[in-house]
Amino acid sequence: MTDTNELFEDQTTALQNSAPIAPLANPQHTVSRGKFRSLTLINWNGFFARTFDLDELVTTLSGGNGAGKSTTMAGFVTALIPDLTLLNFRNTTEAGSTSSSRDKGLYGKLKAGVCYAVLESLNSRGQRVITGVRLQQVAGRDKKVDIRSFSLQNVPMSDSIISILTEQVGEKARVLPLADLKDKFDGSEVLFKQYHSITDYHSFMFDLGVIPKRLRSSADRSKFYKLIEASLYGGISSVITKSLRDYLLPENTGVRQAFQDMESALRENRMTLEAIKVTQSDRDMFKRLITESTNYVSADYMRNANERRGNVQIALEQRRAWYESKSKLELEQQRLIEFSREVADISENESSLEAEYNSANDHLNLVMNALRHQEKIERYQNEVAELNEKLEEQQIALEEVSEQVETAQARADDADDQVEELRSQMADYQQALDAQQTRALQYQQAIAALEKAKQLCGLPHLDLHNVEDYHAEFAAQADDLTDQVFELEQRLSVSDMAKTQFEKAYELVCKISGEIDRSEAWNEARSLLTAFTDQKMQATQAVALRQKLADLEQRLHQQQNAERLLAEFNQKAQTQFETAEELEGYFEQQQARLEDVEAELAEFVEVRSTQRQQREQLNQQYNQLAKTAPAWHTAQSALARLEEQCGEKFEASQSVMQFMQNMLTKEREATLARDELARREAALDAQITRLSQPDGSDDVRLNQLAERFGGVLLSELYDDVSIDDAPYFSALYGEARHAIVVRDLESVKAQLEKLDDCPTDLYLIEGDPSAFDDAVFTAEELAEGVVVKVSDRQWRYSKFPEVPLFGRAAREKHLETLKAERDEVSEQHAERAFDVQKCQRLHQHLSQFVGTHLSLAFQPNPEEQMQEIAAERTEIERELNQAAGNEQQLRSQLDSAKAKLQMLNKILPLVSLLEDETLADRAEECRAQLDEAEEDEQFVRQFGNYLTQLEPIAASLKSDPAKFEQLEQDYRQAKAEQKQVQQKVFALSDVIQRRVHFSYEEAIGSEGSALTEQLRTRLENAQREREQARDQLRQAQAQFTQYNQVLTGLRSSCDAKTQMLQELIREIDDLGVRGDIGAEERARSRRDELQQRLSQQRSRKGYLDKQLGTIEAEIDNLTRTLRKAERDYHTQRELVVQAKVSWCLVLKLSRNSDVEKRLNRRELAYQSAEELRSISDKALGALRTAVADNEYLRDSLRASEDSRKPENKVAFFIAVYQHLRERIRQDIIKTDDPIDAIEQMEIELSRLTNELTSREKKLAISAESVANILRKTIQREQNRILQLNQGLQNIAFGQVKGVRLVVNIRDTHAILLNALSNGREEHKDLFDSQKLSFSEALAMLYKRVNPHIEMGQRTPQTIGEELLDYRNYLDLEVETFRGADGWMRAESSALSTGEAIGTGMSILLMVVQSWEEESRRMRAKDILPSRLLFLDEAARLDATSINTLFELCERLDMQLLIAAPENISPERGTTYKLVRKITNNQEYVHVVGLKGFGQQ
């Protein structure tokens, strides 16, 4: 046994003799421990719905065999650990069996249907927690049970568990399935949760303080179940005692994990260094294989792409030629049909045109004959007209002379009457000589006149009053008679001449109308003369009517011509125009169309010339760009790689230069950040190293001094305080927190003078390290710190530190934070170091790019420009081809439009005639009017001269000269009546004139004399005028005779001319044609027009016949060309389709494998096929050598040499790519692209080599530090076990008076610790070896210092990992103090059954308490977990032992559930009497609960 074990024994002896250790800290607030309140069983065997209220200390189930005690405990255990892999409820019938029943003892305890086992607990927070399981038998031979765990929270205290899990159905109750239970609480405050894993269920129970330890794995659950099982069946469990270390000693996962992390980091570091060396050797191979395979495949790839593009272009050209031939053939066939149709139409129209031409020629001859007759007629008509004019002039002159004769005769008669009247007046006025005589005479004459008037008028009552009325009456009669007499005088005055005129007029009338009665001559003459006026008017209109008829006939002919032209136009234009508006609109449209077509045609010609120039320019630009494109693509590839490396999109050369400058700045900043992070990482490593020490001290001299003084660091004594208490104790001791606790200060004082190396301030505290308390200070805790009363006059206030030194939990918590921060800083440092390397590499690439490709990289894409140029060129070619077709089409449209306009120009002037539907009627009407007018004209020509002669003498026909005597008698009678009436008028007027004479009788005599003289003068004048009138009458009569003779000569000449004219008119009437102005021109124009049309038709027919022959020959040629073009196109298309299938496979392979951008090297597209084959062949030779050692790549390369399957080359490239990708070390290079991997290798290799070398030095584990950590951990756990022993001091069962745990360090491991601490130089070969890990070195050292131990088949690594666990250094045993034997190892064979049960229960209580302490850091501060153990068959304990258990439960605040026979009735706790009964064939357990009667 080592010194350490002896020290432990001494400490144990001292502990037994010392008082109990005071608590480490007095908590300010007491937290109550959680308790199990009840157990509810639903539908179990004997328990349909039973709730057992659990006592706060001991609950006893009392009953006979088969009463249901084990069933109740099984329900509790099942609800606590619902793991079917662990549950195994044994009974006494299986005492000697090696295996239990299939159902693990659970199937038979359940009834059919839904069953529940539910635990109700009340935790430290006062929360009601309901946890349980739903069980259900599964039908089958295996007797399986289905278990579902669940929990309920926020259930009111008033709700019982049974009411929750069942519902009342009439007088019976129904157990709710789990789904209905869930639905029952949906939408309510009650939280129902079903668990699909046991780990989640136990995590919930741990968080709420139902179980003492977090059960993270099945191993933890197994330990917990074994603990329960050992408690249930009692005794000292060998399973637990043999593995007591696993139950009592917590696993120091932090330390072991730290060792493992360091070791794995070192291992990974060394592996990475090896991988770097391998990668360095792979880099050249990567470059060579990638370069050659890329050249080999991409050259063939681009050659196939070029050939495919060329084949497609050839196919397109052949298809275009095929379509052009097809369209030409269709066009020629259409022309053949149109020309054939036109020839047929011309043949049909030719015969009708010939007939029309002959008819027009005959009509022209008739018109010319008619015109010759018309000229003669016009000449005779002119002569007759001149003679008629002369006759009319002579007749007018004769009439004027006749009028002069009549006027002269009337003047002579008037002159005679005036002379006679003046003579009678003068005779009357000679009778008055003087005035009186005259007055008297006048008076007498007035009276006489009045009497005379009375006598003449027969008016005896005549007087001065009514004389005027009678005068007016007789004056009117005198006027009528005067007119009558004047007429008769006129008739009588011309009676001699009238007789001659009558005879002549009668003769003329008889010539015109034939023989008629003389008495009817006047009426006939008057009617002839009346009609003659209209006839002359009609005769004058004959010329106009003839012109009008000619115009109408011309217009009618034009209308017929227009209808014919319109029909031809509609036929040619495929229209149905009828109205003028439609034709005019179409004319304007066609005229506009003609202008547009002409403008468009001119524009086409100009544009075509411009396009040809553009095509030449584009060809020059294309050739220039084609020369530049390969270099541009190379620059673009470099730019793409540069942008991919930089992660930046460069838009211009300035951006590249700016990025270079930014990269330099970024490199400087990254270097500074890297150095700063390196310093931070070193500081964190130092801090982590310090906190990783067991005592948390940053001064190693304190540990040495503590060992020298035989004391313990104060921080080690408080290493087990909780996270919450650690700040308090750190503040409580202040600067003395680094003190050393020694047993005797006086013994240490002597050694202080001998110290040569110690801290500036060294604090020493006297006390027992194994029983130390904090009674040194008087302290008061505040909100943010602690006030410590050092003395009456000195207080110290210390704030709670953020990182307390005390408490392993607090240090580990902060250590986790520091490690996370260290890892983060380390990662940042690696990132910054990588950034520095990357910046340097990028700057190098940027410099190369600027020097080589900058001038071209940012130029516009020549391929895009070439595509644009090619598109423009293609577009220009297409436009030129289309322009040629369009030009031909436009010229055709132009000719068509011109022809249409030419026809429309002929039609439009006649368009008004088309709508004149009355033209034919008006022509007929005009022809009828012309016939009438010509008849009148003929009548005027024949009888106009007679009527002209008749007109002036027609009045002579009124009186026949044979009645002259009667006329003369009538004249005399009228004269006598006139004279008589004049006498009466004269007598009355004389009375009226003499009215004044009745009033006076005298007058002045001088007046009469003057009147006489006046009358004499007037008489002389009248006589002179009479002589003059007689002379004028004689002259007029002589002139009348002369004019009459001239008129007779002219009339005879006119009659001869008129007779000749009538003969000519009859001849022209026989011809049936009217010759007028323009008739010959119209007839000749009509004939010439028909002749021209006939000539044009014949010429057109001859041209069409020639064209038909040419077109038929052209159709034959085009048919042969079309067949050949179709065959060539289909052949080429099959070639394209075959190439497309292969090309699609190539594209599919390249795109699916993401290698298309590697193969599609556009700079190779401008090289010829021979050049590309040369590149591919050179690369093939290099690849054959490169892949000679790789069978897979060699076979793939051999398959790729088949030129008929280009996809095999892509498959080879993919194989190479995949092969290289698999060779990439992902732990070094973060990419799967071999191209990028090469680039990243350049960046990573140098950085990783330096960094990993320095990292390996940092990660090196010190053997001395490992030994120190293990010693401190072992010492801490020994102290903890000593504290646990205090709880077992007063335990007594039978002869056993005490129980304790003994911890010893194994000798072999103690030797190992000494070797680690002291043999640094001796065992340097193991720990400095690069080939051995620290675990392996530790295992080799263990073997070296313990050569007698056999390692077996285990590896050094496994042994080394076990040696890093402090639990393997300790032996833990249970000892009992029994009678005279003293302390001895606890074994069942040396103890009675009751003593073994009590001892085992004590051990289990220690385990539970240890678990609580272990899990205290992971549990909430306000939670103390429930403590409950089981004990079946408690009858083997006597009353004293039972009371001891009760006392132990009370002291440890633990609940106990025991099963006892009926004769056991504890005085304390709660007892349930269970009796199984059968009623009405139904078995059930009758339960009666009793409170302990001894309880106060």
From Swiss-Prot:
Residues 694-811 are annotated as: Flexible hinge. Transmembrane segments: none annotated. Belongs to the SMC family. MukB subfamily. Plays a central role in chromosome condensation, segregation and cell cycle progression. Functions as a homodimer, which is essential for chromosome partition. Involved in negative DNA supercoiling in vivo, and by this means organize and compact chromosomes. May achieve or facilitate chromosome segregation by condensation DNA from both sides of a centrally located replisome during cell division. Homodimerization via its hinge domain. Binds to DNA via its C-terminal region. Interacts, and probably forms a ternary complex, with MukE and MukF via its C-terminal region. The complex formation is stimulated by calcium or magnesium. Interacts with tubulin-related protein FtsZ. HAMAP family: MukB. This is Chromosome partition protein MukB.
